[in-house]
Each structure stands twice: as C-alpha cells, then as structure tokens.
Curated annotation (Swiss-Prot):
HAMAP family, per database record: FadI
Species in which this protein is naturally found: Salmonella paratyphi A (strain ATCC 9150 / SARB42)
Any Pfam family: Thiolase_C
GO terms for MF: acetyl-CoA C-acyltransferase activity
Cysteines paired by S-S bonds: none
Protein's GO biological process: fatty acid beta-oxidation
Keywords: Acyltransferase, Cytoplasm, Fatty acid metabolism, Lipid degradation, Lipid metabolism, Transferase
Enzyme active site: C99 (acyl-thioester intermediate), H392 (proton acceptor), C422 (proton acceptor)
Any one annotated GO CC term: cytosol
Name of the featured protein: 3-ketoacyl-CoA thiolase
Domain of life: Bacteria
EC number(s) recorded for this UniProt protein: 2.3.1.16
Protein family according to the UniProt entry: Belongs to the thiolase-like superfamily. Thiolase family.
Quaternary structure and partners: Heterotetramer of two alpha chains (FadJ) and two beta chains (FadI).
C-alpha cells in the first residue's frame, strides 16, 4: 500500500463537513415539473444557510454543479449566490462531472480549504429532468444564423426554403454518450452480460433498495436532511421523495419488459434509477473555523479519488477503480469501513462493481494490485437504500450520499464510510468520510 495522503490544511486542520441538506427528489414531470435546476439550487442553499445560522459573509466560496445545463444560466453557482441573499462578493463557479458532479464540487471546495484561500464554502448540485434545453436541428440552427445576417426579405426566404419538414422538429437533449452513441442502459446491458448478472439478481437489488429507503423514511432517519418545499401555486408541501415503492413485491419487478435490449435484455425501468429532479448541498469548513463558530461537524473528509476508463465496454466500473485508490489515500482497507454507499445507476452496474471489488483477478490483471479491494459486507452496503429508490438528479446525488452517510455514521457511534459513484465518460469517484 502506498503512503496515505492526509487531507489537512497547512495548519493541520481537517476538512469538516458541518451540515448537509437536500430537497425531496421528484420523478420527472411530477412535483417539480416546471421548476428549473437553478431554482432548486436556490431552495436548498437558502434553507441550508437558514438552518445552519452561519453568518452569510462566513461563506467565502460556492461551487455548484448542473449536468443538464440551461443556456440562460450557464453559471448556476453564481445565480444561486445572487438569488439567496448571500454576500455578493462570494466567489462562485460551476462544475460538471456527470453523475459525480457534486463529488467534484466537494473536492474543489476542499482543495480551496487546504490551499488556505478560504475557510468555509458550500458545495452541491442540482438538476431538473423536467425543465430541459430543447434544441433545434443543426440544419435549422445554421439557417437561423444565416438569416440573422441576411439583408433582404428575399435572401431570408431563400434560406428558409432550404429546410425540410424534419429540420423543424425539436431536438431533446442527448441521452447517449457523445463519443460512442451508447446509452447508459446499453452499457448496463453490456455489464450484465459480461459479468453474468441475472434479471433476478437485478430485481432483487432494486427491491432491496426500495424497501430500505421506505424503512428509512418510516423510521424518521431522513427528516433532518430533507427540507420541505413549496412550489407554485404554493398550496401543498412536498416533503418526501416520490419515487420510493415501499409496497412493491419482487413479482411486480418481474412484470416489466427490458428497456434497452428488447429481445435478450435484463435491464428494466424498475431496476434502473429514474429521471429525477432535485438539489443537494453541504457546508465545508476548516476544523478550526467550525470551532470558532461554535459548530459541531457532521464529520470529516478523509480522502477522495477520481478515475477514468475506456468508454466502449463496461464503462460504468468507476467504483471498482476509484474505491481502492480512495481507501489507499485514507490509509484504510475495506475492513475498516462502517458503511459503504454506492450510487445505483442500474442494478446491473452496481452488482458488477461489487463483484469486481472482491475479485483477485481484476485487482491483479486490471488494476495492477497485489490483492482484491475486498468483498463488501451486505450489512454495511447501501443500508438506507440507494439511487434506484431515491432517484438521481445527476448533479445532486453525491451530496445526498455524503450527507446521508455521515448522519448514519453518527447514529452508529461514528466510524468510516465510503461513498462512490460511476459517471458518464467512463469516470469514477470515491470519497472516504469520517464521523466521531
């Protein structure tokens, strides 16, 4: 094992995660229909600051992410600062790392803290799959640019006459990889076939996720970390995730048809995470700054790692690559963890990564490591359910996982937790958290 890389400031301060909060997560075109991501971000950051009672000028930086970006608000972070009553001099910029976006936001704020340029910052992300940047065809876009430069009506009419009827159709955001044309579900199907993951195994994991998430809500474990929201016309509160199917049975999952490989596939809408709207954020500080303000941190960021692999085959293996690196940098092993939380983009992807974490062959032949990262104990794995149940607003999921894991660690008396996610483009992210 290589030497650990402690995440501390020049003064020896640990990176404290003081608090975290999220909106309820809503299935596409339901509770947050018509609410853009920037407004979801304002909701969660405004409420997070109000609950924390931290002076507004104590926050020196806000790093926020959005995967499905809206052209009218390209820097969502700055819009959140300006729309929440934060100090207008607060540094704010946006990041995007697909499904690991808020992991990246947290890492960026942590690096600013370690560099000594700030002492407190906010990291998070928001996405809306209900408010989308619906575009136009390339042919129409080109004509519109040329029409804007045309000088006469005749020139404009000539340009428009070149268009065909199909060129006028709206173009929704792409759901496929730019470089390969593969959809995420196609990759999940690849992984199911490569690693021999059955439909029954996928449905069982999805059912487990929903059951555990429903139980977490029923036991009141999520109430402190999920805010109540009100949206126009402001008559009814929206306070709980609306994707969780607590009353479902395994037989219900078996009824669904494959969503991607229609003839021979096993990936369905039920064993995949749905399109979702929501936002989440966390406040980070140096340990000494938290003490100055009289705050008791939820926990600390012990390490993080980002990795990348090829996109043509089984590209959602990010957790199998990033987990051993994050553990190594934390000076820990799998056995040292109290909790292990993995983003469930698809049940097939989740099960494939779990399989490879325990594989000696994968460790030696692919990672170049002497031994496997380690089997993940089921009693430590996604104990409150995962993204299949809660949903997945792309840029918000990492902050949800971090906050949720730290709260659960504290309920268990402290310890170490690892959160990890795959992401489009063959990317992976993992973070080791510590609670006392």
């Amino acid at each position: 094992m290589r030497q650990a890389l402690p995440l501390v400031t020049r003064q020896g301060d640990r990176i404290a995660i003081v608090s975290g909060l999220r909106t309820p997560f809503a299935r596409q075109a339901t509770a947050f229909h018509g609410i853009p991501a920037v407004d979801l971000g304002k909701m969660v950051v405004g409420e997070l600051l109000a609950r924390s009672e931290i002076p507004a000028d104590a926050i020196e930086q806000l790093v926020f992410g959005q995967v499905v970006q809206m052209p009218e608000a390209p820097n969502i972070a700055r819009e959140i600062v300006l729309g929440t009553g934060m100090n207008v001099h607060t540094d704010a910029y946006s990041v995007s790392r697909a499904c690991a976006t808020s992991f990246q936001a947290v890492a960026n704020v942590a690096e600013s803290l370690m560099a000594g340029t700030i002492r407190a910052g906010i990291a998070g992300g928001a996405d809306s799959s209900s408010v989308l940047p619906i575009g136009v065809s390339k042919a129409l876009a080109r004509v519109l640019v040329d029409v804007n430069k045309a000088r006469t009506t005749r020139q404009r009419l000539t340009l428009f006459s070149r268009l065909r009827l199909r060129d006028l159709l709206p173009v929704p955001p792409a759901v496929a990889e730019y470089s390969t044309g593969l959809r995420m579900g196609d990759t999940a199907e690849q992984m199911a076939k490569t690693y021999g993951i059955t439909r029954e195994q996928q449905d069982a994991l999805a059912h487990r996720s929903h059951q555990r998430a429903a139980q977490a809500w029923a036991e009141g474990k999520l109430a402190e970390e999920v805010m109540t929201t009100y949206v126009p016309p402001y008559k009814n509160p929206f306070a709980e995730d609306n994707n969780i199917r607590g009353a479902s049975t395994l037989a219900d999952y078996a009824k669904l048809r494959p969503a991607f490989d229609r003839k021979h596939g096993s990936v369905t809408a039920a064993n995949s995470t749905p399109l979702t709207d929501g936002a989440a954020a966390v406040i980070l500080m140096t340990e000494s700054r938290a003490k100055e303000l009289g705050l008791h941190p939820l926990g600390y960021l012990r390490s993080y790692a980002f990795t990348a692999i090829d996109v043509w085959q089984d590209m959602l293996l990010g957790p199998a690559w990033s987990t051993p690196l994050a553990l190594e940098r934390a000076g820990l092993t799998m056995a040292d963890l109290t909790l292990f939380d993995m983003h469930e983009a698809f049940a097939a992807q989740t099960l494939a990564n779990l399989q490879l974490l325990g594989s000696e062959r994968f460790a030696r032949e692919v990672l170049g490591r002497a031994q496997a990262t380690g089997e993940v104990d089921d009693a430590k794995f996604n104990v409150l359910g995962g993204s299949i149940a809660y949903g997945h607003p792309f840029a918000a999921t990492g902050a949800r996982m971090i906050t949720q894991t730290l709260h659960e660690l504290r309920r268990r008396g402290g310890g170490f937790g690892l959160v990890t996610a795959c992401a489009a483009g063959g990317l992976g992210a993992a973070m080791v958290l510590e609670a006392e």
